[in-house]
Structures are given as C-alpha cells and as structure tokens.
Amino acid sequence: MKALTPEPSSNLATEPWHLDRVHRVLGHHGNGQNGNGTRHAAVPAVLPLFKKVHTYSNADRVRATGLYPYFRTISSAQDTEVVMNGQSVLMLGSNSYLGLTNDPRIKEATIAAVEKYGSGCAGSRFLNGTLDLHIQLEAELAHLMKKEAVLLYSTGFQVNLGVVSTIAGKDDYILADKSNHASLVEGARLSLGKTDRFAHNDMDALSRRLAQLPDEAGKLIVVDGVFSMEGDIIKLPELVKLARRHNAAVMVDDAHSIGVLGQHGSGTASHFDVVDDVHLIMGTFSKSLASLGGFIAGDAQTIDFLKHNSRPLLFSASMSPANTAAVLAALHIMRTEPERIAQLWKNTSRMKHGLLSLGFDLGNSETPILPVYTRDMLKTFQFCRRLQEEGIFINPVVSPGVPPGQELLRVSLMATHTFDQIDRSLEAFQKVGKELALI
C-alpha cells in the first residue's frame, strides 16, 4: 500500500468569493462585454433568500488551509482498502462493520434481483411499490428483532424522521439524549410534541426530566443504542426502569448496533436482554448490512399505524430490489457466520489497546467506534491530512457533529481488517500523533 498524496486544492475553491473574480474567471469585463466583445446580461442582484448562501464562508476557510477533508473521491469498492487518486489507502472510516459491502454473495444476490425485478419499484410502499422481497425482509427482521412486525423505509434517516414525527403528537413529550443522531433531532423538530434533551447518557438527568412531566402525558424516550461519535452504549437497563416508573415509551436507534451487539447481531436491547421493555427499535442497512435503507420494529398495531400515517414512508419510493436483496443476503451471512462479529470485536480490542498504549484519548468508547480526541479543530484537520499522506483514510469530526472542544478522529473497525492492517495503522498514528504533539 502506497502512501497517498492528496490532490492540491484548486485555486478556484480557495480564493475569496468576489464578484469581480467571478467575472475574471468567466471571461467577463467591467464594460458589460464578454471575452468575445459581445454584450452579456447584467449580473442580477442577490435575492434576499440567497444572501446566506453568498455570505457562507466556513468551507472556503478550511479549503484555504489546504486541509479540507470532505467529499473525497473513492474509485473502488468499500473494503478494508480503497482506491483514491489511483493509490491504495487503508480504510478506517467505513461503517461496514461486518465487511460485507464487497462480499461476492451479496453482489450476486443484487444482480439476480435486478434481473428479476428491474432497477426500481417506481412507487411508494403504500401504492405500487411493495414487492414480495419487502415482505420477506420485514418478516425476517421481525424474527431477528423478536418483535411482532417491521416496516421498511428507503433510508435510515427517513425512519427516524417518520417515526418520531408521527408517534409524538402535540400533547406528547419527547425526551432525547443530547448526543442523539441528527435524524432523531430532525424527527423531534418535525413533530408537534415538546422536546426535552437530557445530558448524554445521564440517567439521573433523565429521571429529573421525567419527574417534572404530567403523569397523564404521552412520553417517548428516544436514544441511540450505540452513539455514532462517542462509541459508547446507552445505559438501557437503567433507562427502561425509569420508563416503566413514569409510563413512558422507549425507542432505540440501533443503526450502529445491528451486526455489532446482541444475539446474532440483533442490537442493544438484545445485548442487555431487555427486548420486551423497548417499544420501538430502529435499524439501518447502510452499515453492517451492506446496503441502503432502514426499518422500525415494534408491535403490530403501532407498525400498522405508521404504515398509514408516516409521511416519509407514504410519499417516498420504496427500497430498490437490489438494496432489498442485498440486505436479505447480508442477514443470512450474519446469522450463519457468527465468527464475523467475534472477529470484529477482536479487531476492536487490538486497535483500542494499541491506541491507548500510545497515549491517545479514546473517551468512553465501548464499541468498534473509537473516537481519537484531539479537542482542537485545526489539529483534527491536520491529523486527518497527515494520516491520508501516510495511506490511512479516516473521518474527522468537528462542530456541529460534536460540541466545540470535543473534536475527534473517528476510527471504525471492520471484521475483515487484518491484524497487519491494524498494526500498520497504529504505526501511522504513532508517527503523526508525535508530530502534532498529541502523544
């Protein structure tokens, strides 16, 4: 694997955004003529709506440093190593926890589905977009999650947007962990319910909030199972006890728990043996299950209510045949090859021990998500760039992804990483960490 030299930022992206510069780049001249001497239309004034667009400069300021780390282009399958700019790079930023995105069995299943069903469903689940594949997948997921019923959505984001906004009405309360995923935040904003956010994974804070609410009010406690940036696990046994005491419902976002925690990778509630105490469990297919889409699992009556009232479901096209078939194949592999989850945890242990022994701060991580805290925005971008130059792809996380002062590099392990790859990445972390005085 060769070290990767990042592409230099273009001058167009790094220079200040001025009208005269736009004219210069496009061949315009101040006399109202273009480069050919013919007249052009006057540049219209900026509409009030778009003033925020023209004054936005955060991305340009980062580009100007030469450290802009977003929208990097990959020209290969998502695997333990990927190709960028024609060079191989070790991938430590993927959410493919079981390493299935490039599995030949899943690719064969998607090809077969396209050959039988075509490329899309051309409609919503509510109308003409329900395939027998969707029904089969919902049944298999209900069995895995030990719930009466499951409903598929086209993306994981849509699940949280649709479920929270539909379930929580104007007289209801939503109690949300402050570190919840953005999709849960947006679902709460879209709902008519009143939202109260409690300190991250703080059950005392949640207890105080619950005690302040009317006994007769509807209450939904919504949390991540595994928090996507911190890598810690919700204190679910304590949470469900509080929910019972205060007559509240519980919804767990298991996007980063499926394929990682619980029996056969079935998630956080299974991990803590409290499945019956969690009313709704959300999962996504874009991580361990090597596809795209999401689901909500719960009792049959609630799922039927969502089928007929959840607008992100009703007014979105259904999951494609290829995506659905990929999940079915991935579920089969996850059930029949438990050694994958075991290897994921072995890899996590090796990387975590290595990073800690080097002196890095990993916070309270308990999962294959390992946050390497820099607590500094510039150092986060510098660290990301230097690791890329050393042939390591990693994701930087700064505000608003985390609060200011909690900036980090997010390491995520895959079951298919080798110990050799992990050890090589640790060597790069040691080298760059010392350069930046982080260790």
Predicted regions and their residues:
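Active-site phosphate-binding strand-loop segment of PLP-dependent enzymes
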Residues: 196, 200-252
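Conserved PLP-binding catalytic core of the aspartate aminotransferase-like
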Residues: 342-351, 356-391, 401, 406, ...
